[in-house]
Amino acid sequence: MTSHRKHLVRDFNHFITCFVCKGYLIKPTTVTECLHTFCKSCIVQHFEDSNDCPKCGIQVHETNPLEMLRLDNTLEEVIFKLVPGLREKEQQQEDEFWRRKESNDENGPMCKKRRVDEEDDDKGDGDYHRSDPQIAICLDCLRINGQMGENIVKGLMKKFIRCSTRVTVGTIKKFLSLKLKLPSSYELDVLCNGEIMGKDHTMEFIYMTRWRLRGENVYPMVLEYRPRIDFG
């Protein structure tokens, strides 16, 4: 008769805890250069002051180590299944963070008109918001004189939207193509602070790693779009 050994959560701690904070991995994020994994917030904060992996010391990237990070959704699901109640606790903390962030930032004088515009948008389009944390975004058309396609890509009549923090740049591109009635083959670039964003980047990732690091930036986050430029 085969005997089955029971494993405790602590048997797996080496694989599911963060080297930086020593807690369970929250939004596990892997450094592609060395394959070490950390909490997303821990590694992003570490890279504000260093370009080296905090565990092995290897230089991740000379100028922008954030480009070498990849979320590990599979590991996140494994951790949530191993640790009872962790998913609910993390979701509650995340919801509270975004509610507090939006409340604090939108009280500023520069944001009052934007908030009114967002409310008008909601009245016109209905409330299709998901139950997960929301983020307000301003979508600005980036105009470059003489660029091909500038007559096709226009500014939106209602440029303020509210969406899930988990929405990706790819989804934003589809939204823009639909609103601007662009051909299915037409491609756009989406930028934050002048940097082209990858299609798999989420709004939360962009906010945390690009937008909030600029002290002069206010809420809501501004993303710019333009006809795609082929540098090849």
From Swiss-Prot:
It is found in: Nucleus. PROSITE patterns: ZF_RING_1, ZF_RING_2. Its main location: nucleus. Residues 93-128 are annotated as: Disordered. SUPFAM superfamilies: RING/U-box. Keywords: Metal-binding, Nucleus, Repressor, Transcription, Transcription regulation, Zinc, Zinc-finger. A zinc finger (RING-type) spans 18-57. This is Polycomb group RING finger protein 5-B. The gene is pcgf5b.
